[in-house]
């Protein structure tokens, strides 16, 4: 019986040694005809700012396509400025205008025309809380609560500083400075 098992094992070993691999069928092979330059890939992470990332990415790609050079604009600069304007509109309409994450292509164009653009190095995402990516969960919770309290509150008159700037605007700007960083001048 031992001889039979040994003979069978040797036979299997020899047969497996003679087996040939099946030729692998190679799939379709792409050939690069023309390679267009591209901008860096961005990650919005945990922020409802796809509107800003996609629009600025489109503008950067268009500048590159037109031969104007490679740019990397700061999404957080546009987000910071447009959120402050949105907060003002939400308070003026007593909350009838939505103050929340999200936006549109036009918000970036509006921000670009009104505030301009700065390079990413001036205002990086996540830098204020030791990250390289955005996380606006806490920012949204805090700023939404402040804007809702002022917009839907029953205050007959809002407090202002000596220059007649409403204090709530300074509070919202400070919140955004803390989470997004101060805006460069």
Residue ranges and their predicted role:
Residues 21-185:
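Catalytic-core signature of thiol
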Residues 1-22:
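Bacterial Sec-dependent N-terminal signal peptides
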């Amino acid at each position: 019986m031992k001889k039979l098992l040994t003979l069978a094992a040797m036979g299997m070993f020899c047969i497996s040694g003679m087996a040939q691999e099946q030729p692998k069928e190679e799939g379709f092979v792409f050939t690069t005809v023309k390679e267009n330059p591209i901008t860096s890939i961005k990650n919005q992470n945990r922020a409802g700012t796809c509107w800003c990332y996609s629009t600025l990415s489109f503008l950067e790609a268009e500048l590159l396509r037109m031969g104007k050079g490679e740019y990397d604009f700061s999404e957080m600069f546009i987000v910071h400025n447009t959120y402050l304007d949105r907060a003002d509109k939400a308070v003026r309409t007593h909350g009838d205008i939505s103050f929340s994450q999200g936006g549109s292509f036009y918000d970036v164009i509006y921000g670009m025309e009104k505030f301009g653009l700065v390079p990413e190095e001036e205002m990086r995402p996540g830098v204020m809380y030791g990250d390289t990516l955005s996380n606006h969960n806490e920012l949204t919770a805090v700023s939404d609560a402040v804007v809702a309290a002022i917009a839907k509150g029953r205050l007959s008159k809002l407090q202002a500083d000596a220059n007649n700037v409403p204090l709530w605007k300074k509070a919202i700007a400070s919140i955004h400075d803390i989470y997004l960083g101060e805006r460069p001048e």
